[in-house]
Amino acid sequence: MSHPLSSLEYQPDILGEGYEQATLEFLPDTEGTVVATLIRKKTDQPTSKAVLYIHGFIDYFFQTEMAERFNQQGFDFYALDLRKYGRSYMSHQKLYNVYHLSEYDAEISQALEIIGQEGHDTVLLSGHSTGGLITTLYAAHHPDHPLIKDLWLNSPFYDFNMTPFEKKFLVPKLSRLGKRFPEMLFPSRLNRHYVPSLHISYQGEWHFDLEWKKPSYHWVRLSFVHAIHEAQKEIHQGVRLNIPTLLMHAHKTTYPLRFNRNAQTSDVILQVHDMIEHAQKIQGDVQLCSIQNGVHDLVLSEKPVREQVYQQLFQWLENKAL
């Protein structure tokens, strides 16, 4: 469903001054009406460069510091809240429900069309965690997209954080079950210290909506497991990317059973070595960058750490002439 500029209406966004949002409408799915939300923050001066950012699982866009750092570098910043997440969730929907990650192609394509209509000819596509998996495949499946010039991945979800035995035998079985019984539930295993380690009300420094980025989420639908597994299989087989790609990850993974410094200085959600292993299967110009003491969402790491993230990122962009 196309959204020409004449019909697109931006409204003030919850993030405050300078942030706007527009609702993108799509064909209904099995649950009914479907929308996504495009958020933008423009630079003070006209620019032809833009960023499009895609969030992770149980997440939404709230990282204002990231948007403002891109603005300072001369990029207009755009982010999507995908269907059934954050700003885009509707009461008749099951949170985060998806059967195939290609469902999100509609909002990514629509957002890119709008970004082009708004005067940009150069886009850095970016994704965190599940968003990193989604954007990797989007770039691979759209190798000749006229706008996408580079890809920045922040701890992409290239494999389940499970034992080798579970990855080989349990995940494929759960995925097959998910195709037949999509509503069946499975324990999520998400580390319960991660979100509290970030939020200002617990041990962190960030303000975000705990309904949209929940402190705990105990069960996932097998439809999600199936969608992720199918996408990861494609990554594992070796996709081709014809744009420069920067994949950033924390320097280590830990499994804190109670809150400690590891929760704020390492990835407690995904296995770093999985990202490295599967990134090496990608054909193309892919650069890996390890961030000492980084957390899963690297731009939410402690101040000195995230300064390293931005320094490395913007140096890479400069080297790639973006």
Positions of PLM-derived features:
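N-terminal cap/lid segment of alpha/beta-hydrolase-fold proteins
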Residues: 1-45
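Short beta-strand element of the alpha/beta-hydrolase
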Residues: 48-56
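Catalytic nucleophile-loop/oxyanion-hole region of alpha/beta-hydrolase
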Residues: 57-58, 86-122, 305-306
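Conserved alpha/beta-hydrolase
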Residues: 59-67, 71-91
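Alpha/beta-hydrolase-fold enzymes
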Residues: 130, 134-220
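Serine-hydrolase catalytic core
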Residues: 186-286, 290
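Catalytic active-site module of serine/aspartate enzymes centered on a nucleophile-bearing elbow/loop
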Residues: 285-322
